[in-house]
Amino acid sequence: MSEDKSGSFYSMYKLCGQLEKESSHSGKTQLIKSFCNVFKGDLYLLAKLMLCKEDKRVFRIKDKAMLKICSHIWDCDLDDMIEDLDNGDFTETCKKFYIEYGKYPEKSTLTLKEVDQVLDSLTVSGKFEDQVKIINKLLKRCTPFDFRLVCRIIDSDLKINTGAKFFLDAFHPQAYDAFKKANNLKGVIEKIQQHDFDNDNGDGDDGDGDDNDDDDGDGDSDSDKKKKKSSGGSGSDSGSKKKSKSFEVAIKLMTPIKPMLPKAVKTVEGVVKSSECFYAEIKYDGERIQIHKDGNQFSCYSRNLKPLMPWKVDEVKPYIPKSTKAQQMILDGEILLMDTKTSQPLPFGTLSAHKKNGFKDATVCVFLFDILYLNGKSLIHLPLKERREILEKNVMVVKNRIEFSEVTIVNGASEKSKLTALLNRVFKEKLEGLVIKDAMSEYEPGCRHWIKIKKDYIHGMADSADLIAVGGYYGSGSMGGLVTVFLMVCYDKQNKIYKTVVKASGGLDDNMIAKLQPKVTSTMTKISKEVSKIPYWLDCPKQYAPDFIVKDIKQAMIFEIESAEFTKSDHHTTGYSMRFPRILKIRHDKDYKTATTLEELVEIGKDIKIVPVGKGDNNSPTTTTTTTTTTTTTTSSKLIKKQQLSDDDDDNDKDSKQQQQEPSKLKFVSDDLLDPFNDKSDDESNKIFILNYVDNSGIWNEKGLSGAIGKKWPSIPKSFSQGDSNIIKSGEIRVEKVKDDSISTNKKVFICNLSCIIPPKSKKESYTFSLKEFKSAIKEAKGAINQKKASVHLAKPQFTSPSWSELDEVLTKELYNSGIKVFVHSISKSSPTTTSPTTTSPTTTSPKITSPSSSSSPSNKLSPLKRGRDEKLEHEIIKDIEPSLPIFEDVNAVIDSKTIDQVDVKRLINSIKTMGGRVSDKWQQVGIGKTTHLICNGMSDLYLHVDRLGGTIVLPNWVDQCFGSDKLLPLHEDYIYFNKKDHPDYSQSSSSSSMSIEEEKIVVTTTSDDPSEGNQQQQDKKVIKESKIIQSKDHSSTTTIDTKITITSTNNNNNGNDNNKTRKKQHLLSIFQECIIFLHDNVNDRETLKRYIIAYGGDISDSVNDKTTHLVASLPNNFSNVKPKDLFKSIINNNSKNNNNNNNNNNNGIIVNSLWLWDSINMSDLLDVKNYKLF
């Protein structure tokens, strides 16, 4: 048997350890270069294992499967391993339990070749018994640290933050580019060895000056990319081209090439500026396929460069030789299911469904869009225009089996309308989107130099719904131990049950995930995916059983979920799901009753959104002529057929048809609604009516459009609120004239308040917009508008019902048809400095309004907020008026039901929760469920308890006032409850002074029994200060509430006269009376705990001495790595020396877990320490 010279696996382990510690890019590359200069093993094997993310082998073992194998070998509890896995990385779990197992070699003897052979054997071993044998054999040769590294290779993540670029740049500056193009690691390594590590720029820098390794996959700076586009080449100079050519690695048949990819843009403008001439290709909603043909042999690869499953391609394989006579070729395309009756692609996911059920009228079809290799020659350096010609000359269309992608040639910005029309057609036909390609561009493997534009990329066109988060799942990797994925559901009114829609995690950053954990802990209970523990009110499939489930649906969080589209799904119990879901925000203003229902979800899914036609588009039609180089007739006939089909669909959808044939007669503009006479205004009228929506309560709304009006013209809300005339009956109007010196004397603005908002009958309900009252108010307003010969300006209301088309119909019928001009204000598509009115479709977004302070400066205009649907609503207009956080976000209140009526208790609970706060049943001073406010209106035991602990105690009217004013009010004496008369801790003095609550000094006195103290006052604990900082709603200021409690110790002979009220000696309970306690620094919330100990009769020791009775630390009972005595070792040793010097007895007390203190407090009794002893 020949000697294994592949190299030591332990040496690779040491290299990984160094790379994990090194943070700089150049440092990592230098470490690799230094290591490989002395490495005598197989460099290709080393590269193969180090670049495990590039290894396309399928090992058939996931994290929990590996734990199951290991638990079987080590005879340990699988549940314990899974529980440990919940805390993070499964590779760490494997290492930890391997160490506990104890039977492992002391020294690593594995070689790289042996590890590679083990990995190869795992790719062909699908049975559990075979996998156990392979892993068991491996474990006999490797240490726990070796095994962790093997597991990381299997998991394709070495956790060293070192990609292919870092590794290959250590050898040659062109090595990574060659690898990207050919995806042939062995060929690259052989080339490196031929160059004998000659490296002119092997510092690991990608040459773009941005310290980014894999940001775009091409290593170009922004300026380089611009050069690349202008030149039509790769963006390199002639010298670098020469270098690249000298290092070029040939494309190899049957070795997949990294696909060229598109990057996202969010506007049509961003596309048309990308090139003077580009191909706009239909983006088919299937799976990427790369076909390699070598004679009669075929291989098909996925986007991830892995072989496609045979069942996906077997149907279409026989048609490949029928479509071409070429012997060798590499084709790029998309595989999907085609409806043979309509010749229309079927939605994403149907290909998998076809495997199980089969579709009678559907076939598997490949849409080809590129050719990379032909008869021994690479074509990737040719421009796209030439490659497309070669593709169409060498491949013939086989109907519904082999097709070409549909292409529209667009000549830059001059043909923007053609692109807009094509997009509208794509979205209406529910295709995925478009891919934009520069006609003169090369094929650059792994680079994102194409552009993709999809519905969910265009601002506001994505589908969204407010769903209920009823379950949570643990994250993985660095997010292990945190709940990062949520099970989203909606309510099925017909069947009276909650049904699943989607699992969502995207959209949350690390900070938001951390913020959500306390909410998860307090409102959810752990069920560890046990189906039997799913509540009766939730219809949840077994495979979606979560790690956590909400305790009470009323406490569930509401998330706004945005997605590319709604799709039908057999996996979720609603029958629907969402593609590419992401969490936009938490809806603190909604609860389980006001979240999207299943019926509403179905309606949202029917919605077809249209891209606004921009200025100069001349109302282009929604169809377009498409051409390719040689298949113009085929493409055009297909387009006509698709247009006929879309027309047929319109017959079934009256509203959609009407919208297409009869566009809105109203004028959609992008001007500032509150500045209608600006220079850019398209309105020539000298008198303007601005419509404002109000209710019949007589109270001016300080939010939304009303709030913006009040800020700019304060006289309007003031006039509105004067006398009894401020109450406007539903369906009626009231007109207020604007007084503004900045408006020319010959021009006038009127605010027309329409009473069409119906206020809620209770706090549980919400405001609604009445179409009936809106019609009535508009009819009444028409007379006033005609009398003044004015035009009308308005914003779309903030309500999703009624629909805008219904309001459009009323405005058109009553105003436009009566000769009144109507302007609907929307978001500008251009920059603030060049904003101009644009005529758009009715689905254009809503108005932009500047704040009063910035109205004169276009550059200071507020940017529009993100829309959740296709229409931006009124409440999204002003960012200052609609802050993102609820005003009671940091409030967790306890309501004293003994001092407040039950009716008021319910009202307070609803108010607090509506404003984003929480309500708890009992007072909790610290921890996740820490309470912040006690709400009471009289003397009670609960009041005394919280008062003695220095808690914040408020009257119910504070909550009511905050709710009414919609802002967090500062706590002053009108809101703070403090009962001095009946308080048992206070004694009356003959000459007590009347002091305000802020000025009053509260003194807690105790009587000393030690005669040696004489008349000297001893201050035991001087000041305990608790400062509660409550963020105000707009985050611009904070309210600080300081509670100072001075605790002094005075002897019986104190002759001082105190005219203020003084507290008597008073303890809640004397449960710690005999205890002198030392708190270690690691104890959580030490200051609060000190206060509790003192309040409950105990004493605090600042150092360990012979009088100390208890030493307290925060450690779990089942600690393993830290010995509790070690925590106090230095303290005890120092104390022992002092005691020996003083000839004192050495009694250091008992070391106990801090839980002993908390449990004793909660049980109101001194518990036995034996269950809490740590030493």
UniProtKB/Swiss-Prot annotation:
Which residues are in the BRCT domain?
A: 883-976, 1067-1174
**GO BP of this protein:** cell division; DNA biosynthetic process; DNA recombination; DNA repair; lagging strand elongation
Q: EC annotation?
A: 6.5.1.1
| Necessary cofactors | Mg(2+)
Which amino acids does the record list as binding Mg(2+) 1? E334
Which locations, inside or outside the cell, does it occupy? Nucleus
**Bias type Low complexity, positions:** 622-635, 829-859, 987-996
Could you name the domain of life of the organism this protein comes from? Eukaryota
> Which key words tag this protein in UniProt?
ATP-binding, Cell cycle, Cell division, DNA damage, DNA recombination, DNA repair, DNA replication, Ligase, Magnesium, Metal-binding, Nucleotide-binding, Nucleus, Repeat
Bias-annotated ranges (Acidic residues): 199-221
Record's compositionally biased regions (Basic and acidic residues): 1019-1036
Q: What ranges does the record give for the region Disordered, renumbered to this chain? A: 195-243, 612-669, 829-869, 984-1036
Reactions it catalyzes: ATP + (deoxyribonucleotide)n-3'-hydroxyl + 5'-phospho-(deoxyribonucleotide)m = (deoxyribonucleotide)n+m + AMP + diphosphate
Q: Which SMART domains match?
A: BRCT
Where along this sequence does the record place binding of Mg(2+) 2? E432
**Can you tell me which residues form the catalytic site?**
K283
Listed Polar residues bias regions? 1004-1018
Primary location group: nucleus
What's any one GO cellular component for it? nucleus
Q: Which Pfam families match?
A: BRCT, DNA_ligase_A_C, DNA_ligase_A_M, DNA_ligase_A_N, LIG3_BRCT
Molecular function as annotated in GO: ATP binding; DNA binding; DNA ligase (ATP) activity; metal ion binding
* Enzyme class, broadest EC rank: ligase
- Give the similarity note: Belongs to the ATP-dependent DNA ligase family.
Q: Which protein, by its recorded name, is this?
A: DNA ligase 3
Q: What is the lineage of its organism?
A: Eukaryota, Amoebozoa, Evosea, Eumycetozoa, Dictyostelia
